[in-house]
């Protein structure tokens, strides 16, 4: 069955966030329970995102950027800036609090921000697991070019590649950049799958 979902747009302090899941048409896709696209936007000098500390339990968040930078801090003591192509995976498990802010150096000038954050439901057996945070630099992610497509496996397994990101359930999360005449078949090894089209 094919379902087409138009993301709902929210304005968060001058930054547009498009939420595709959950909706009435799809409460989740596989383990993905939230799918948010941030931007694309250019934030003015002296401004940025300021998501204050807030808690999560029983899930994991995955952050991936195409442009810009976000500083992540959490109650485990993690303090990490994510940049384009990197992956931040935060396992909330039995509980974690974190904040996300534009780093000070970025605020010194106009700066772009474009990214995706997904929330993944942990299996019942892992809902109370210890909280954890892992940063994976862009160079550590499997990449391949085929048929005019550039594939980066963010999390899980696809196209014969496996991401170093530790997952708790069968996960398919791949960034695909297509040339104008490129084409790619979606990996069919997953019962539920979706395609989020940026442009």
Name the predicted role of every residue range:
Residues 1-7:
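Short, Gly/Pro- and small/polar-rich lid/capping loops
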Residues 9-66, 141, 146-185, 192:
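A short glycine-rich, His/Asp/Glu-containing loop-to-beta-strand
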Residues 35, 65, 90-91, 117-121:
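Short beta-strand segments
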Residues 57-77, 83-87, 93-97, 180-182, ...:
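Glycine- and acidic-residue-biased ligand/ion/polar-headgroup-sensing regions
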Residues 80, 86-88, 98, 112-116, ...:
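Generic beta-strand structural signal
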Residues 93-126:
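Ligand-binding loop in jelly-roll beta-barrel domains
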Residues 117-124, 137, 155-157, 177-180, ...:
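Short, structured patches in soluble enzyme cores that scaffold and shape functional sites
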Residues 120-151:
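Long amphipathic alpha-helical segments that form oligomerization/scaffold cores
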